């Protein structure tokens, strides 16, 4: 079925505390992830929480990438939504690698053209 976009939702566990708590590192990682997927970056907004955690969004011409990090749990929730021919898994894989995620669960949701059919996203295999 033809869709308007692909939305990958990643649950990242066992991530490095310092990386999850470093707003500049996360911002750079997300911009690089967007560029590696072939996206055109439009806007970038990130916020550092006290005592820890980062939330942010990279708006791309093709949609968006978001993160909410919980360093105290080694956890990050990631969304990568792309329209057109871009593969959101390219960006999601890069982010998981950069955050050194030990465990990753993904789902991919086709958006905008009919009933939602949730499927496991094809995540790049990672050695633990």
From Swiss-Prot:
It catalyses: S-adenosyl-L-methionine + H(+) = S-adenosyl 3-(methylsulfanyl)propylamine + CO2. Pfam families: AdoMet_dc (PF02675). The modification Pyruvic acid (Ser) is found at residue 63. The record marks 62-63 as: Cleavage (non-hydrolytic). Is synthesized initially as an inactive proenzyme. Formation of the active enzyme involves a self-maturation process in which the active site pyruvoyl group is generated from an internal serine residue via an autocatalytic post-translational modification. Two non-identical subunits are generated from the proenzyme in this reaction, and the pyruvate is formed at the N-terminus of the alpha chain, which is derived from the carboxyl end of the proenzyme. Binds 1 pyruvoyl group covalently per subunit. GO terms for cellular component: cytosol. It comes from the Bacteria. Pathway: Amine and polyamine biosynthesis; S-adenosylmethioninamine biosynthesis; S-adenosylmethioninamine from S-adenosyl-L-methionine: step 1/1. Keywords: Autocatalytic cleavage, Decarboxylase, Lyase, Polyamine biosynthesis, Pyruvate, S-adenosyl-L-methionine, Schiff base, Spermidine biosynthesis, Zymogen. InterPro entries: AdoMetDC_C, AdoMetDC_fam_prok, AdoMetDC_N, S-AdoMet_deCO2ase_core, S-AdoMet_deCOase_pro-enz. Its EC number is 4.1.1.50. Heterotetramer of two alpha and two beta chains arranged as a dimer of alpha/beta heterodimers. Belongs to the prokaryotic AdoMetDC family. Type 1 subfamily. Catalyzes the decarboxylation of S-adenosylmethionine to S-adenosylmethioninamine (dcAdoMet), the propylamine donor required for the synthesis of the polyamines spermine and spermidine from the diamine putrescine. HAMAP family: AdoMetDC_1. This is S-adenosylmethionine decarboxylase proenzyme. It comes from Bacillus licheniformis (strain ATCC 14580 / DSM 13 / JCM 2505 / CCUG 7422 / NBRC 12200 / NCIMB 9375 / NCTC 10341 / NRRL NRS-1264 / Gibson 46).
């Amino acid at each position: 079925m033809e869709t308007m976009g692909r939305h990958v939702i990643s649950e990242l566990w066992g991530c490095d505390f310092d990386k999850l708590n470093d707003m500049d590192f996360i911002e750079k990682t997300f911009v690089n992830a967007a560029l590696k997927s072939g996206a055109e970056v439009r806007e970038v907004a990130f916020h550092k929480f006290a005592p820890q955690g980062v939330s942010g969004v990279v708006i791309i011409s093709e949609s968006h990438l978001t993160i909410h990090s919980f360093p105290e749990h080694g956890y990050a929730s990631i969304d990568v939504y792309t329209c057109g021919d871009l593969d959101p898994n390219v960006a999601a894989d890069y982010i998981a690698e950069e955050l050194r995620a030990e465990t990753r669960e993904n789902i991919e949701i086709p958006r905008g053209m009919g009933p939602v059919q949730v499927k496991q996203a094809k995540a790049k295999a990672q050695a633990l």
